[in-house]
Amino acid sequence: MVVMSADLDNHAALNNALTEGWVVEPPVYAMTDAGRRGRRVLQFILWREGRPRVMTVVDTPEIRAWIDDQRWPIATLR
C-alpha cells in the first residue's frame, strides 16, 4: 500500500519523514497542483522498510536548491 501525504505549506513533514528513516527515491516529480492550477508542487517517493510513501510539497526556490544539493533529478509531468 502507498501512503499519500500532503504538506503543501512547507516542507517540515518531508524533513520529519527523512529524520524517521524514510529515503527519497529519485527522481522528484514536478507538476501543477490538481487543486490549484496556478500552483506548482513537487512529489517525492519515499521508502522505508519496503513500504512506499508519496509526499507532496509546494515547489519553492528553497526546496529546489535543496534538491539540487542532493543531486536528485526532477521530472516534469505536467
Residue ranges and their predicted role:
Residues 1-78:
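Terminus-proximal functional modules
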